Amino acid sequence: MIKQTYKKWIAACTVTSSLLLGACTSTPPSVRDVSIVPLPNNVQQDSSAFILPKSCTIGITDSRLAPAAEYLAGILSPSTGYNIKVQDGEGTITLSLGEVEGKEGAYQLKTDTKKINIKGNSYGGVIAGIESLRQLFPPQIESKQIVDGVDWAIPSVGINDAPHFAWRGIMLDVSRHFYSKDEVKELLDVMALYKMNKFHWHLTDDQGWRIEIKKYPLLTEKGAWRKFNSHDKECIRQSKVNDNPDMAIPESKIRIVEGDTLYGGYYTQEDIKEVIAYAKVRGIDIVPEIDMLGHMLAAISNYEGVSCFDETGWGTTFSSPVCPGKDSAIEFCKNVYSELIELFPYKYVHIGGDEVEKTNWKKCPDCQKRMRDNKLKTEEELQSWFIHDMEKFFNDKGKEMIGWDEIIEGGLSKTATVMWWRSWAKNAPSKTTGQGNPIIFTPNGQFYLDYQEDKNSVANIYNYDPMSEIQNAEMQPLVLGVQGNVWCEWIPSRERMQYMAIPRLLAIAELGWSNPSQKDWNAFARRLANQFERLNIMNINYRIPDLEGFNKTNAFIGEGIVNITCLDPSAEIHYTTDGSVPTLQSPKYDGPVKVTETTDFTFRTFRPNGKPGDITTTRFIKSEYTPAVTAAPSNPGLKATWHEFKGNKCTEIEKAPVNGNYSIEDVMIPKKVKGNIGLIIKGYINAPQDDIYTFALLSDDGSTLVIDGEQVIDNDGPHGPREVVGQKALAKGYHPIEIRYFDQNGGQLKMKVSGNDGKEIPFTHLYAH
């Protein structure tokens, strides 16, 4: 039995910014502000409170709500110790179906001192109301053990709420690394808490086949298991180098067969049914994906007649695909999906359709014959022929098809739904909706949750406006919603998966649910801070948000102040200045620290249970104003040299052949530069006055910044969108500047410059060459 009080969590708010002072208050729970994620449309609150009685019952006015009532009882009973019964008719808490204004999923939640009523316009609406009720209770309600000393009180409220988008989803890739059915259920629990209603299950890929298909047993007997590949080996390396057990390969996913160490796992069809039922109770639909025509190596390596040639493997970029010219291959695909469709009741199935290596098709006589017979001019049209054929097959079985945005390229059918992921394919949303097709937004720049999170990631999701991508406002109703994708090449464990997905998942949930007119980042940050205690009690291994108040490099003149803040009020910060990794025995950061000499700090956050978080290094550099040079450049802007570069280090760009030279007004990729990109940008920056300047360099992939011959920012190496910030003290006048950048299918480069007052300096008149 756990002994603690509801107010005890307030003492954990040891490190937070002034932004979060509202989250750390000793106000009694009965009059606390409502702090729900995602933000409800309308909340009315008074000073009275409802206190959960031991005699609490949950009443239902419709038998279809029995699973929802049992679900709610399962939330409330363990921590309170109350034996909460479900009954027909009214109860202390009453669940009902009825007319509620708004899209499907709308609900009303009304509480007074004696009763709680939740009414939804659908089963999903009642579940949404339950999740709001759940967040009104103290976070200890999430405990699986009885918690003593808590007033199970909630404020008296009237909430009228409805979703903004119908689709609020998360995709989990279980092929690259496998997650057990219980680990999937745990993710579904978090999704439900934040009113997310679509779970996209990426069940197969080159690296593993994860679903039992009874007609083709080798798919799981062999296709579900592999020797350690390059992804596994890199995860193991990182687990050792960074002392991070979350990057280790779980022993439960390893077996020894004839002396070989194999990694993998799969779901039986009974497992699949169990997870579907679990999700249904929580108002979540499951969308299965068997990715084809590409990403099928786990299948084509085990069955003949599926690929173009007997020899399979990797082409120029991607793996050998299914052969759309062979009837046997098409029969195989339809047989697989026939079993899948029998298992999954939701109307959508996802065919994938992305990243297909078409080289084999050009050489394959079967593919070329198929093209001639159907008057197809290109291999892209051949892919579309296959997609359309499969879609008709799905439609005949009562299903609708979703595909990644590549399915647009050879011609889009009238009934397909597109999932837009390639942020660089800017015309895909308008092209899709212009043809009248629905679209789901999951652009990789913001919504790929396998990309390393930084201090801007959550805000970038929260502030994203999907409608800005649709040129014709009349087509905006075709936007079904948003989805975050967790690709798992580098995510080997349940702990790492949760770390990468959360708290970004909460921002996606709010973007998908809440009214855009109510968008307020600071208010969301306060509500987000209130969620961490709840997630801790749920044993969710979320990522502690980045520490704030400093840059990667910080310049000071005379005396500097290290003033650190953290969005998570439960986080504890420890630090060292000798380069060693902080532990709980290292000095604890509990307030501003003065520095008078150049000092290297290493910070590390710790969860309430003592588990360490990220390691952050920063340098505070004692500086003088670097003198300006006597140059008098006559041309505005900067000079960019484009190299035909295929490497992954900025220092090697100049070795590659030159494709062209360009004048640019700001730090950017010139419009004509495409393909293999290595840029060396040179010129001068004109400091308007003696000051300490802050440079924020955002790139996807690598970049570096050098000023006056000194490196200010190192953002090198292949990576997703990442911003690194550094400072330098500059005297008034011109200073030589060099930015290097390379692209490995990212296509983002920009830099913001601000003075010591924090105001961004416009690029106009800032650069010259």
Positions of predicted regions on the chain:
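Active-site neighborhood of glycoside hydrolase catalytic domains
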Residues: 299-304, 310-415, 422-436
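Flexible, acidic glycine-rich loops studded with aromatic residues
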Residues: 401-406, 411-416, 422-563
